[in-house]
Design a protein with these regions (language model features):
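Conserved small-residue
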Residues: 69-153
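Residue-level detector of the transmembrane beta-barrel scaffold of outer-membrane proteins
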Residues: 21-23, 63-65, 77-81, 162, ...
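Flexible, solvent-exposed coil segments and beta strand-coil junctions
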Residues: 38-48, 61, 136-145
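Outer-membrane beta-barrel signature, preferentially recognizing the C-terminal barrel domain
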Residues: 1-21, 49-73, 111, 152-158
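C-terminal beta-barrel architecture of Gram-negative outer-membrane proteins
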Residues: 135-139, 172-180
Length: 180
C-alpha cells in the first residue's frame, strides 16, 4: 500500500473588515510505495503493469492567496482573487534504482520531472559543429554515459488572477492563468 506523511501549516489574515483576505501556506508531503505503471517489454503484449514503486518522493511548496472585495453595493459588486504556488519535489530514496528500468529517468535528490541532456560546451569556431562534454572521457559522445546534465522541466511557479464583476442579475467572471 502507498504510504503518505503530510504536514501543512497556514496563516490567514483578514484586513479592512475582511475586504482584503490573505492566506499563506506551506506544505510537505512524503510518499512511498506509490502505485505506478512499471514498463514492460513489447513482447508481453502490454505496455506496463501496476506495481508499487520502491521509492520515496517529497513534495513541498508555498501557496499565497489574496482575495479582495473592491466594490460592493446594492446593484454592483467587484471581487478579485490572486493566487500563486511555488511547488518543489524530489526523489528522496529509491532502493535498487541503478538496476531498475528508471535508472536513466530519475536521480536521487533531483526533481521527478527531469530530462538528462548532454552538457553543451559551445560551437567549434573552425567547423561550426556543436561541442558537448565527454563526461566519461572515452573520446565519444554516447548515451547514457555522457548524457548527465540534469534539466528540471517542472514549473517554477504558477497561479492566476480572477475577477468577478456583477451588475444587478448579470455576472462576468474572467481568469488569467500563468506558469513559469
Amino acid at each position: 500500500w502507498e504510504k503518505n506523511k503530510k504536514f501543512e501549516t497556514a496563516l490567514e489574515m483578514g484586513l479592512l473588515q475582511d475586504k482584503v483576505f490573505i492566506t499563506a501556506a506551506y506544505f510537505q508531503n512524503r510518499s512511498s510505495n506509490q502505485l505506478v505503471g512499471i514498463p514492460l517489454p513489447g513482447t508481453t503484449g502490454f505496455t506496463s503493469m501496476q506495481a508499487n514503486l520502491n521509492a520515496v518522493v517529497q513534495n513541498t511548496g508555498l501557496e499565497f492567496t489574496v482575495n479582495t472585495t473592491n466594490i460592493t453595493n446594492d446593484s454592483f459588486n467587484w471581487k478579485t482573487s490572486f493566487n500563486i504556488s511555488v511547488p518543489k519535489n524530489k526523489l528522496v530514496a529509491f532502493r535498487g534504482l541503478q538496476n531498475s528500468a528508471y535508472k536513466e529517468q530519475f536521480r536521487i535528490g533531483e526533481p521527478l520531472n527531469i530530462q538528462l541532456a548532454y552538457n553543451f560546451l559551445g560551437v567549434d569556431p573552425e567547423t561550426g559543429i556543436y561541442q558537448f562534454e565527454d563526461v566519461n572521457g572515452d573520446g565519444q559522445i554516447t548515451f547514457p554515459d555522457d548524457k548527465q546534465t540534469v534539466v528540471d522541466l517542472s514549473p517554477e511557479f504558477f497561479g492566476g488572477l480572477q475577477n468577478q464583476v456583477a451588475y444587478k442579475r448579470w455576472t462576468l467572471d474572467f481568469l488569467f492563468q500563468f506558469v513559469k
